[in-house]
Structures are given as structure tokens and as C-alpha cells.
Amino acid sequence: MKYQLTALEARVIGCLLEKQVTTPEQYPLSVNGVVTACNQKTNREPVMNLSESEVQEQLDNLVKRHYLRTVSGFGNRVTKYEQRFCNSEFGDLKLSAAEVALITTLLLRGAQTPGELRSRAARMYEFSDMAEVESTLEQLANREDGPFVVRLAREPGKRESRYMHLFSGEVEDQPAVTDMSNAVDGDLQARVEALEIEVAELKQRLDSLLAHLGD
């Protein structure tokens, strides 16, 4: 596949894609902004604790590969980064808003069911129903320039099969044995997480506003 990302590169690109949609007033992101986004505890699996130097290394690599570009000058006191991974002027990868939302959520959280994806991607795109989620996943799985996602075998105790992105290579389709006591309703859990994400982003916006008022 043309697009091959390491786990850390996937996290960085996923964060930039997410913030471009959910907090456009804070986008593009500085290095510190990318570090905060990579390490946030909501809507991330696994939760990471990356240092600034680790993130800077990933940013430099992605700029060299033309997946990101730097933005400086015109009032920016620090270098900022914006994604060119998809939907850029000269890039080949073109995705719909629904496709961006699903790909971003998969980059940030790994394999998930359609129900989990619908709830967790709601901040980026409001799917009308589960049929739209599933049809978008099928489109991503069958694109001529892809496939970009794959459907995994259904795990024990789960009602839905999970999907995973293919931007980091092929996925080993080996469902783990799941404790039935942990087989909670994925939709409900995802909705709770979506609310936590919304609260965290509102707090981030409030902190940013207070910081500007204090300048």
C-alpha cells in the first residue's frame, strides 16, 4: 500500500486531522499542541506519554514525506503544523467528511465496531444512521486506491465485527478471548467516551480563551 505509517506517525496525523475539524480556531498546531493532542486521555487508545523531542522527530519525518507542512510567519510566533495527508491541494488522497471522521477515529483508537465508530466520530461528522457508517466503511474497504480499512472477525461476546485501518500495514485477524463480564455494550461505552471528549474539548477551548483574555 502506498501509505505506510508507524504507530507514532498514525497518532500524530490522527491528532491533526481531528483538531482540524473539532477545534479549527486552534489549528494549525504548534509542537506543544501536537504533544498535548497525542497524550490526551480521551479518545486515545493506547494512551501515550510522548515527549516533545519524540513528537518533533515524528513531525520532521512526516514533513519530509510530505504528509505535513510547516506554517510560519504572518503573526505566528512559533512554527505550526498542518496535515497534507488527505484533501490537500496537490495530494492524491481525497476523502469525504464521513471517511475522514472514520479514518481519524481508527488512527487514534485502533480497531472498533461500527457502533463505537459512530459515537466516537460524532464530533467530526454526524452519521444519519448505522447504515451510513457501514456503507462508508465498505467504500473505504473497496476503494480502487485502497483498501484503507478491513473488517475483522467478530470477537467472542461482541455483537458486531470490528474494523481497522490499513495505513500501518496488514492486520493480524486473531480475535482475543474476551472475558464475558467485560463484554459491555460498545455503543453505550462509546457514547460515554464521546461525552468525555466533548467536555475535554470545551475545557481546552475555555482555557485558551482565558489565556487570550489574560494577554
Swiss-Prot record:
| Record carries keyword Flavoprotein | no
Organism for this UniProt entry: Escherichia coli O139:H28 (strain E24377A / ETEC)
Name the protein family: Belongs to the UPF0502 family.
Q: Which residues form a coiled coil?
A: none
Q: Which InterPro entries match?
A: DUF480 (IPR007432), WH-like_DNA-bd_sf (IPR036388), WH_DNA-bd_sf (IPR036390)
- A single Pfam family it belongs to is DUF480
Q: Note whether Acetylation occurs among the keywords.
A: yes
| Keyword annotations from UniProtKB, A to Z | Acetylation
Which residues are recorded with the post-translational modification N6-acetyllysine? 80
Name of this chain's protein:
UPF0502 protein YceH
Superkingdom per UniProt: Bacteria
